[in-house]
Amino acid sequence: DEGTVRGHIGRHLKDRLQMDVFVDGSHGKEAVTHYKVLERFGYVTLVSCRLETGSTHQIRVHMKHIGHTLFNDERYGGDKILKGTTFAKYKQFVENCFSVLPRQALHAKTLGFEHPVSGEYLRFDSELPADMQACIEKWRGYKINN
């Protein structure tokens, strides 16, 4: 599973702390995000995103726009248990994952840019932080019918 999200991103009209997608292009600037599913864990999915543009909160906003908020992203609704059952055991599991990863599940694996003076292309790679890796391992071990 993979796809592309296109839509202008600008300041949310009612909540100035959030950004929003304006598909009609009436606000903001053009933004393009390519995504690819890496692994599915029942109620959450690990994805890789590649950006063509660089807008504020781009991944967070585009993922929310297509109905897939980032795990534990309080600003955009990913801190809510939106999918799955309402069983106490599931809620307890998710709350435990929130405590393991007390921030939005977002990591810049690769950053690259052209140096402003030398013109040399610089690329930096980084492995997943321990908290994200621990949360992923918890989801790998979770069975939907627990």
Model-derived segments and their meaning:
Residues 1-146:
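RNA pseudouridine synthases
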